[in-house]
């Protein structure tokens, strides 16, 4: 499958700068997906335009690539993944997911990270454009999700997901996936 993983821009209130550091989580998930045979493109919206800043709503600073530049950078993908680590960033990440949905209405949009893991039903309710939330450590769960999507399997067989099901959009969740115990088997990050 063709996959794009997106690290959104960093945001701050201006009182303190955003942490513009390499984002390991999405790099590890990208590496796991590549090792499983998927074509993965990682877009680090902070790292790919680190000097760009934009004032948002008159009080926040966004660091990194603009949404329109992302539209030029993203390639058509079957699955597009996002990360949201911090709850204070969700409102901005939601806007990004909504923007990408307009560009790629047929893609499956997946989100993970600490905020999403903590409030998956809220994320799905607050952002109707989002299809699936990955809960907890994503390396194994995301690869199992891709395998299941590729063979048109049942999402209920993949532990660690919350998703909408059926025409009514009922939320379904699967049992939480176990923690990764053998961390030496995780592939090195895909930079």
What are these regions (language model features)?
Residues 2, 32-180:
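Glycine-rich beta-alpha loop elements in corrinoid/cobalamin-binding modules
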Residues 2-17:
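Nucleotide-activated donor-dependent transferases that construct or modify glycoconjugates
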Residues 13-15, 90-92, 184:
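Short acidic, gly/pro-rich beta-turn/loop elements at beta-sheet edges
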Residues 14-26:
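Glycine- and acidic-residue-enriched helix-capping/strand-helix junction motifs
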Residues 23, 160, 188-190:
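Hydrophobic residues in alpha-helical membrane-spanning segments
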Residues 27-31:
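Hydrophobic structural segments
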Residues 179-191:
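A short, charged helix-loop
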């Amino acid at each position: 499958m063709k996959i794009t993983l997106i690290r959104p821009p960093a945001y701050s209130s201006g009182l303190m700068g955003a942490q513009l550091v390499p984002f390991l989580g999405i790099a590890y998930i990208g590496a796991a997906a590549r090792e499983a045979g998927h074509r993965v493109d990682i877009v680090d919206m902070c790292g790919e335009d680190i000097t760009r800043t934009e004032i948002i709503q008159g009080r926040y600073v966004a660091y990194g690539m603009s949404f329109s530049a992302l539209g030029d950078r993203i390639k058509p993908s079957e699955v597009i993944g996002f990360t949201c680590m911090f709850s204070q960033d969700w409102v901005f990440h939601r806007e990004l997911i909504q923007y990408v949905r307009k560009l790629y209405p047929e893609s499956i949009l997946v989100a993970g990270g600490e905020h999403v893991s903590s409030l998956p039903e809220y994320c799905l309710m607050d952002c109707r454009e989002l299809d699936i939330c990955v809960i907890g450590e994503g390396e194994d769960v995301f690869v199992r999700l891709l395998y299941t999507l590729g063979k048109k399997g049942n999402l209920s067989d993949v532990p660690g997901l919350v998703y909408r099901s059926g025409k009514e959009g009922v939320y379904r969740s699967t049992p939480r996936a176990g923690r990764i115990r053998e961390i030496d088997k995780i592939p090195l990050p895909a930079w």
